[in-house]
Each structure stands twice: as structure tokens, then as C-alpha cells.
Design a protein with these regions (language model features):
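Hydrophobic N-terminal alpha-helices or hydrophobic patches in metabolic proteins across all domains
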Residues: 1-182
């Protein structure tokens, strides 16, 4: 995110667009949507690369974590449509529980009222995608203001990063308590 942050901080929207397309594989439509898409990208990448893997590792061990990661890669890069569709369905099932645990963690370390208001009817829904749930919960917990160019926009990325760190600390603390009790 470094080059994007630099371009956004300078107020150089065109450079930010190019960096988002090149480095993050995002296809933004409008200037304000670009920052929201990058925020969503940050939350989703942190979820699928760290939180979901850690969740399955702690719950079922290294094979489950490896299986999740391989399933994620298959759903993103499979060339056969049938294989990709099946991997997406299995990944949705694998993502259901850790995404909700992360959303709950966001509520604990962020704005609890905003998260419960935003996700009250969707938290237990099977139909909502994990990415949508994580992004919505992260933005609500972080109390994201309207996107703006410049330093204020970059600050929202820092706020989301701090939210992710606090959520990781909660997960580690919960795991430590669990280990002590068992």
C-alpha cells in the first residue's frame, strides 16, 4: 500500500488509480470509491491472509490452515469453471465462522454500537459473502468518515490497520486464555 498511500497523500488521484490497478488489481470507478475499495482490500487481505488462517490453525491444526489457504488460492486462480465454482462454494463454508468471529472482534475493539447496528440482521445470514461482512464490519468499527484526498484519506488506512492490530491482540489473548484453561 506504500505507493498508493504516497500518491493519495500528495493528492495525485491519477497516480493513485494507476497504483491501485497495478499493485492491488482494483478497478475503481470514481475518486471517492477508490479509497473505499483500498480500505476494503486492506480488510479483506488481512482477513484471508492472517485471520482465517490463524482461526483454522488454532481450531483444527496446521492441515486445516493449509487446506483453507489452498482452497482460497484455488477459488482465485482455477482455470476450470467447475473447479472454481466448487472451490468458491467450499470457501464460503470455510469463511462463514471466522468472518463472524472477526466481525465480533471488530465490535469489541472498535465502535460496538455501529457494528451491531450495521450487521445485526446479517451476522448469522448464510447468504452474505465473507468479504462483504468483513469490510462492512471493519468500516463500521473504525468509524470511517467520508473519503477525502490527502492526509485525512491516508489516516483512514492507518485507522483500519490499527483496528486490525487490536483485533489480532484480542485473538491472541483469547487463545492464551484458552490454552491456560485447557
Amino acid at each position: 500500500l506504500g505507493p498508493f498511500r504516497d500518491a493519495w497523500r500528495r493528492g495525485d488521484g491519477q497516480a493513485a488509480y494507476h497504483v491501485a490497478e497495478r499493485d492491488l488489481a482494483l478497478q475503481p470507478e470514481e475518486g471517492t470509491q477508490l479509497l473505499q475499495q483500498v480500505q476494503g482490500h486492506l480488510l479483506w487481505q488481512a482477513y484471508q491472509s492472517f485471520f482465517a488462517v490463524i482461526f483454522w490453525y488454532l481450531l483444527l491444526g496446521p492441515l486445516a490452515a493449509l487446506a483453507y489457504r489452498l482452497l482460497a488460492l484455488t477459488s482465485e486462480h482455477a482455470e476450470q469453471a467447475a473447479l472454481r465454482e466448487r472451490a468458491v462454494q467450499l470457501r464460503h463454508a470455510f469463511d462463514w465462522l471466522p468472518a463472524r468471529v472477526l466481525a465480533s472482534s471488530f465490535a469489541l475493539v472498535g465502535n460496538f454500537v455501529a457494528v451491531t447496528r450495521a450487521l445485526l440482521h446479517e451476522l448469522l445470514s448464510w447468504d452474505i459473502a465473507a468479504a462483504q461482512l468483513v469490510i462492512k464490519a471493519g468500516r463500521a468499527a473504525g468509524e470511517m468518515p467520508a473519503p477525502v484526498m490527502g492526509e485525512e484519506g491516508v489516516d483512514t488506512l492507518d485507522q483500519l490497520w490499527q483496528l486490525l492490530i487490536r483485533a489480532a491482540v484480542v485473538w491472541y489473548a483469547a487463545y492464551a486464555v484458552w490454552v491456560l484453561l485447557i
